[in-house]
Amino acid sequence: MKGLFLRIIAIVALLLWAIDMVFPWQQIMRSEENRYTAIQSRGKLVVGTINNPISYFIDHAGQAAGLEYELSKAFADYLNVDLEILAMSNGDELFSALKNNKIDIAAANLLYQPNKLDMFQVGPTYNSASWQLVYRKGTERPRSLGELKGSLSIASGSELTELLKVEKEKYPDLIWRVNEKLTPEELLIQMADGKIDYVIANSIDVSAVQQIKPNVAVAFDVTDESTVHWYLPSNSYSELQASLLDFMNSAIETGLIARIEEKYFNHLAQFDYVDTRSYLRAIETVLPKFAPLFEKYKGDLDWCLLAAIAYQESHWNPDATSPTGVRGMMMLTKATAERMRIQDRTDPEQSIKAGSEYLHWLITQMPDTIKEDERIWFALAAYNMGLGHLLDARRLTKSLGGDPDNWLDVKKNLPLLAEKRYYTGLKYGYARGYEAYHYVENIRRYMNSIVHYYRVQQAQIEETLDTQAAEIENINEIKKETDTLATTVTTQ
């Protein structure tokens, strides 16, 4: 009887232990599933990010843009809910918002960080990057952390602090400052402007800033390449995480991620210091003269794109002439000028108007099967090498097993139009397809530089105005206190 009683006690204890173990797990699962349910109930996905040229920014037209924005928008559409973006200044703010349930996902080209795994879940990887130490071109290049001769700054919220603590054992004189106010982009710009000596930043952020600050130079990689992820709230496997996994798999299979990456940073690998520096100088000194014309004749295009085309064609020189006879700002052939009914190809207004109209016409010639946001790249290739050769490139792509409606597939085959084994079987024959390839890539790079140049300029203007307003308010407060003191003295 006593043995039976002990067995009953043991069974009850085991059941209580099982309940104690399972119940919290169920609570965790229910909590995280409630987050997914809450997203559906509120009809809105809230994503936190950091404002920069790659992840998220508001362009000159007031529209949201960026890789993380477009990917987040696609995920929100997948969930059939609206999207709300909350822009943070740094990683600390971002992860704090995630921890405190102010956002559902943190998405800002965030590298895999083992020190975050106790607090957060990571989504599937969709990119890779490394930490790089950067310095200002024209100053002495350090070869290691032990050769730094000045101030080193990092943005808050990353694994860098822990990494640098380890490095300090090797380099005892290593000192750094964690900046809790500035974004990585702002830190890089300050370094380029001589306010900071060194910065460690994500290689993606570095490549983006180099398009507007070409004196940002990479000294060395601090780490090897690591995977990039979205971060989700803590807890176990959840319905939200499962949905994200399904979405990412679909985005990879359909080419969505490849198209978004192509749009925002695949062309950044072509960075050229001399060309970028000359281009930015032209943006400052030449573009303001012609910007109103690009705006006037943009039609359905972004005026920055039209300006980028003109720079690629003539470096904004209205009198430009090539050995083949093309002339003017948009480097029009005589036949195209006659077709567009313009009299003087060297007149900048006539040239820009005709170039825009011709490009709009080329866009209408693209098959409806090509996605709306990719039609412009096909049209630009046709603008450069002719519509017939572009059609040949699409046919060749199809014959090689690619998708003729996918710009990524077609552009990699453009150089083949100059190879005899391929062009002999094409309707329009030989073409310098490699030139068309670089033509489109350059225009995309030039356009991004214009967009972000004006974005940074506007941010600096707003910062200056805020500073001036604060100074005026401070002066008024001092004056008010002085007047009060004077009144008190007079009364006495």
Swiss-Prot record:
Which catalysed reactions does the entry list for this protein? Exolytic cleavage of the (1->4)-beta-glycosidic linkage between N-acetylmuramic acid (MurNAc) and N-acetylglucosamine (GlcNAc) residues in peptidoglycan, from either the reducing or the non-reducing ends of the peptidoglycan chains, with concomitant formation of a 1,6-anhydrobond in the MurNAc residue
TM region(s), chain numbering: none
What compartments host this protein? Cell outer membrane
Single biological process term from Gene Ontology: cell wall macromolecule catabolic process
Membrane topology term: Peripheral membrane protein
Ranges for the region named Non-LT domain are 19-268
Q: Does the keyword Membrane belong to this entry?
A: yes
Q: Where is this region: LT domain?
A: 270-492
Does the record's keyword annotation contain Heme? no
* Entry EC number(s): 4.2.2.n1
Function, as annotated, reads: Murein-degrading enzyme that degrades murein glycan strands and insoluble, high-molecular weight murein sacculi, with the concomitant formation of a 1,6-anhydromuramoyl product. Lytic transglycosylases (LTs) play an integral role in the metabolism of the peptidoglycan (PG) sacculus. Their lytic action creates space within the PG sacculus to allow for its expansion as well as for the insertion of various structures such as secretion systems and flagella.
Query: NCBIfam families from the entry?
Result: PRK10859.1
Protein name listed in UniProt:
Membrane-bound lytic murein transglycosylase F
Give the source species.
Answer: Pasteurella multocida (strain Pm70)
- What's the source species' lineage? Bacteria, Pseudomonadati, Pseudomonadota, Gammaproteobacteria, Pasteurellales
